[in-house]
């Protein structure tokens, strides 16, 4: 388990700072399977997880739902046959916060 996966999310208000370019470089290096996407001007973390069938993809999605509820931080999730696309960003600040990197790392632990 990575250092990030062991951290707790903090409450993120609309005036919370987005990660800086330096923080982004440091944090993304800790979750190398994730990429940064920009949609409608909003920076987001995204990863596609592959599975052997829909049932396994759905089981992963349900584990992720439990994780998101426990941490009060919710991703975009697209569940399809054989894959789940997970997108993390902080809605309140319309961008990336350290919480998103923490949750991405925690999402990776669901495969263990």
Swiss-Prot record:
Alphabetized InterPro entries for the sequence: PCD_sf, Pterin-4-alpha-carb_dehyd, Pterin_deHydtase
EC number annotated for this UniProt entry: 4.2.1.96
Coiled coil: none
Keywords: Lyase
Top-level taxon: Bacteria
HAMAP family: Pterin_4_alpha
Organism the protein comes from: Shewanella halifaxensis (strain HAW-EB4)
GO biological process: tetrahydrobiopterin biosynthetic process
This protein's name: Putative pterin-4-alpha-carbinolamine dehydratase
Family under the similarity heading: Belongs to the pterin-4-alpha-carbinolamine dehydratase family.
Catalytic activity: (4aS,6R)-4a-hydroxy-L-erythro-5,6,7,8-tetrahydrobiopterin = (6R)-L-erythro-6,7-dihydrobiopterin + H2O
Record GO terms (molecular function): 4-alpha-hydroxytetrahydrobiopterin dehydratase activity
Any Pfam family the entry gives: Pterin_4a
